Amino acid sequence: MPDIRVNGVRLYYEITGEGTPIIFIHEFAGDFTSWEPQIRFFSRRYQTVTYNARGYPPSEVPEAPSSYGQNIATDDLAGIIKALKLSPAHVVGLSMGAYTTLHLGLRYPEVARSLVVAGCGYGSEPEERTTFQWDAEELARRLESEGIEKIGKIYALGPTRVQFQRKDPRGYAEFVRNLLAHSAKGSANTMRAIQAARPSLYDLADDLKKMELPTLILSGDEDWPCLKSNIFLKKTIPTSAVAVFPNSGHAINLEEPLLFNTIVQDFITQVDCGRWPRRDPKALSTSAVFSRKQST
């Protein structure tokens, strides 16, 4: 199995296809297999890359929680892009992977062509932050004490997962099987040191305002923890656009693969053609008629 040593750990990866590179970064409950519908589609025209984050076998599973963190995850991603000579790559992330994608755009913009930030926002809303951090710590504790088979089944039935179960029972069953094969230790460390500890999106506002990379923000309309923060990202990143998937939860690339692939393909095509726009500052006016300058 192909692996590469990056940032002090061994990470498993797969490359399929040839052309302009696209790298996909998985969510907490996923792994490299979560991107199969995208690899089958995009590898016909692009070089596609998937990998398992640290803590997700067959990648290395460090024992110490201090070996995990948002900055570490971002350094891992940048390291893979550089080591595999993918720069600059289109970068597509879901949930935890979307946070890493966004942080890559802030810290390593030179290695990216564009960013797709899907299902991003959990734990960012100020009124929900304490609850999210408590839930994350409790989930980590139970993963360690009760194991992935029991807790993974509970996690897979969360309020933003049932949409996938309803739409595609076979795909959902495969998602659960893959989740239950994860490392309890790696998942607990990831939940505790990355999910619970990462900064709120709102804490990044000043840096996001300066970001110049073309950015596509995606979420399901029933992925409640992401909706408010996605509007914040749209308002804050001057080169961003947002699309919301109807009747959809969290894993939108698996729930609605055709729609996801079509929207991302159109975005990447516009970027590669130099046609992705920067927002007109007048579009931020709260008036439906006058720009801020006109109304003062």
Describe the function of each predicted region.
Residues W224-S229:
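Conserved alpha/beta-hydrolase "acid-adjacent" motif
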Residues V9-S66:
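Conserved HGGG/HGGXW glycine-rich cap/lid loop of the alpha/beta-hydrolase fold
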Residues L102, L106-R107, A112-E146, K150:
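Flexible "cap/lid" loop of the alpha/beta hydrolase fold
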Residues M1-R10:
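N-terminal cap/lid segment of alpha/beta-hydrolase-fold proteins
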Residues I39-R40, V49-V92, M96, T262-Q265:
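Active-site loop/oxyanion-hole signature of alpha/beta-hydrolase fold enzymes
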Residues S240-T296:
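Catalytic active-site module of serine/aspartate enzymes centered on a nucleophile-bearing elbow/loop
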